[in-house]
């Protein structure tokens, strides 16, 4: 069967109008959304503000300028440590141009900085919690505006005081900014919104937080409903300008603040934030883009020769294959950035002609490029990657690889829009409606987020003075009901929630307390880059040249300066691994894309969970005794088995083949479940939060056949 011809679209550029005025940043003429958030914060207007300006439209400056000029201490939460570092660099460069920038103290806090930089700064502190407490006390005692850049994991630990240190300084922040919020999972969104809502609703004499700012794509219906109905703070879309009786004078004109434009058509008062793009889409399965590209190598090389190009793929093994092949061509300055190759990022960004990458550059890495080549396994990834072509008015090119089902749905749309410059908003609606929805199930809210929140509330009750405990519990219950239960479901009571909470044992609750959950990772020494990190164990076993070692032997292979990092990372990993590069299969089994055969094995508690508990009553449980099997064998795999067997991890096994389960429960290719050796037949297993999501989908099927809601509450 011949390959279908690609479909093409001409996407109009996106321009934002500039509006002059007394803005507190030198050399800046702001956009409407920047004026809007400036006016809200300088007027001290309390609320939840969502800024969904396009990528490259200056969302960071929209909050940074007013909080610094007005002296509003702010905690800004970013999804990745790379983005924290990037923002720290960008904000530092801006401070001299912002009114009040000289009176600002900028802090970047991650687990790495707490273990290294701040451990040296506060040698008397014996834990991360104590270091963070001392750091914030010192910052606030300076009487400067404090800007804390951190990740969601640190923020959640701060708010819940899981560091076991009373870090009261978090209550002194007046503004909370959450970046890239649309990229968070359902569990992550629920956790963040609940904790921020609780902080906002606390008496101002206790907690000063009055402004919640979310930098995000346009919120979908469910998320907008959460903002409007669950949060105590009034909800505003920044572009709506709805909190001002008299809008800013510069914005009272009839001209639109946002326009689409074709090449050469951008009016003088507008700046391009997204260029006109010639978009070509071809079909390729998820994790199959590299194969598709290499099968059409001549065409791909012709495209890459026409301009500076960024390639964004899904799997590191795809990067390995494409990068290795491109390095053997006549292309110059081919670079790669991924989880194993983050050294020298700035130099690579400045010098590449072709950059091969994955989600490592999807957010947090600024680059300029003439064109992009990317895989779009879901709608969010498709538009995030397409949006990396930005802040240019010149016509650009994009080459996308989409799931085959989506490609076939787009063929008639492309024919109907042939030779037209298509409005991006309309195009985005069409694409999003065509993707299969593999989002997490709505029942996760009341099955698990409610449990997590209830446990949090009960801990707050225990810490409260006896006279306040009843009020804390009632307020907490109302917040749980607002956030996680459908108001149309009558008859829910606190006893119902206590019953749900009783089902979850303490080990499961500990898993829920973490922001991102857990996965099966191992501690890796990368001999190529001379770095230590944790990484996904299934990927390493399938696609890497690795060996496993005892801890003592592992340490003998490390440079002295890396040994201190081991104690920081080993609590989050299983085993000790040395990485030498890519796995090179033998000629007999030369399918590099597939890699080694890898599976987990059902033993001990995991076997009992599968064999002794029917699917209709089986729940995720924290198990030990996990084993792995890999063919061809890996040096030291028996050592890994010993380390892995004693670790505790949240598991949910199901009977059936992986692909069967993915199809049956609409998990999509990124609903991570793994094959499981089971003596009674085919089986698969999910870990961490993925285990909870899969359990919800299974129970939703059972709920469809249940006659009463009480049966569902009992799982």
PLM regions and their residue ranges:
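N-terminal helicase ATP-binding lobe
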Residues: 1-715
């Amino acid at each position: 069967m011949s390959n279908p011809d690609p479909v093409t679209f001409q996407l109009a550029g996106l321009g934002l109008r500039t509006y002059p005025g007394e803005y507190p940043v030198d050399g800046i003429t702001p956009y409407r959304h920047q004026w809007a958030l400036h006016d809200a914060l300088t007027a001290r207007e309390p609320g939840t503000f969502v800024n969904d300006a396009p990528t490259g439209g200056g969302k960071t400056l929209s909050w940074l300028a007013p909080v610094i000029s007005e002296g509003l201490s702010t905690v800004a939460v970013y999804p990745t440590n790379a983005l924290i570092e990037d923002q720290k660099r960008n904000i530092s460069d801006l401070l001299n141009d912002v009114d009040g920038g000289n009176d600002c103290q900028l802090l970047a806090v991650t687990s790495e900085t707490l273990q290294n930089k701040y451990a040296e700064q506060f040698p008397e502190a014996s834990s991360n919690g104590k270091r963070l407490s001392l750091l914030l006390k010192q910052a606030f005692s300076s009487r400067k505006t404090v800007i804390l850049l951190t990740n969601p994991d640190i923020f959640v630990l701060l708010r819940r005081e899981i560091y076991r240190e009373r870090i009261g300084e978090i209550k002194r922040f007046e503004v909370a900014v959450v970046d890239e919020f649309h990229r968070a999972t359902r569990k992550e969104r629920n956790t963040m919104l609940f904790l921020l809502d609780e902080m906002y609703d606390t008496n101002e004499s206790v907690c000063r937080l009055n402004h919640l700012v979310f930098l995000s794509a346009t919120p979908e219906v469910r998320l907008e409903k959460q903002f409007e109905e669950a949060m105590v703070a009034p909800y505003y879309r920044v572009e709506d300008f709805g909190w001002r009786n008299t809008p800013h004078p510069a914005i009272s004109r009839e001209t639109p603040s946002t326009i689409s434009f074709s090449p050469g058509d951008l009016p003088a008062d507008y700046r391009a934030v997204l260029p006109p793009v010639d978009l070509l889409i071809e079909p390729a399965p998820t994790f199959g883009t590299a194969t598709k590209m290499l099968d059409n190598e001549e065409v791909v090389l012709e495209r890459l020769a026409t301009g500076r190009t960024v390639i964004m793929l899904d799997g590191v093994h795809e990067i390995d294959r494409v990068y290795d092949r491109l390095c053997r061509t006549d292309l110059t300055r081919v670079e790669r950035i991924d989880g194993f190759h983050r050294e020298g990022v700035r130099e690579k960004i400045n010098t590449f002609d072709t950059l091969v990458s994955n989600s490592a550059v999807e957010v947090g890495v600024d680059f300029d490029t003439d064109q992009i080549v990317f895989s779009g396994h879901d709608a969010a990834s498709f538009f995030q990657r397409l949006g990396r072509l930005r802040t240019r008015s010149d016509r650009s090119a994009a080459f996308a690889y989409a799931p085959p089902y989506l490609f076939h749905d787009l063929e008639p749309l492309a024919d109907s829009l042939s030779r037209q410059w298509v409005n991006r908003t309309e195009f985005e609606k069409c694409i999003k409606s065509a993707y299969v929805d593999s989002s997490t199930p709505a029942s996760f809210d009341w099955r698990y987020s409610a449990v997590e929140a209830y446990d949090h509330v009960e801990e707050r009750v225990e810490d409260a003075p006896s006279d306040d405990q009843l009020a804390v519990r009632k307020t907490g219950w109302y917040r749980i009901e607002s956030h996680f239960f459908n108001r149309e479901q009558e008859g829910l009571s606190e006893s119902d929630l206590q019953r749900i909470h009783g089902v979850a044992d303490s080990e499961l609750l500990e898993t829920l307390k973490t922001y991102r959950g857990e996965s099966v990772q191992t501690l890796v020494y990368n001999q190529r880059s001379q770095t230590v990190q944790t990484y996904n164990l299934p990927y390493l076993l399938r696609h890497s040249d690795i060996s496993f070692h005892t801890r003592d032997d592992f340490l003998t292979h490390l440079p002295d300066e890396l040994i201190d990092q081991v104690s920081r990372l080993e609590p989050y990993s299983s085993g000790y691994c040395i990485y030498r590069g890519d796995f090179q299969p033998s000629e007999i089994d030369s399918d590099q894309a597939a890699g080694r055969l890898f599976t987990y094995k059902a033993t001990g508690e995991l076997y009992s969970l599968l064999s002794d508990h029917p699917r209709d009553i089986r729940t995720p449980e924290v198990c030990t005794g996990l084993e792995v099997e890999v063919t061809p064998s890996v040096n030291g795999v028996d050592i890994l088995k010993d380390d892995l067997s004693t670790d505790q991890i949240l598991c949910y096994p199901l009977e059936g083949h992986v692909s069967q389960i993915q199809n049956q429960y609409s998990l999509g290719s990124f609903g991570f479940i793994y094959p499981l050796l089971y003596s009674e037949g085919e089986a698969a297993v999910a870990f961490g939060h993925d285990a909870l999501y899969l359990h919800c989908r299974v129970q939703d099927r059972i709920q469809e056949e249940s006659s009463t809601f009480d049966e569902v509450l009992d799982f």
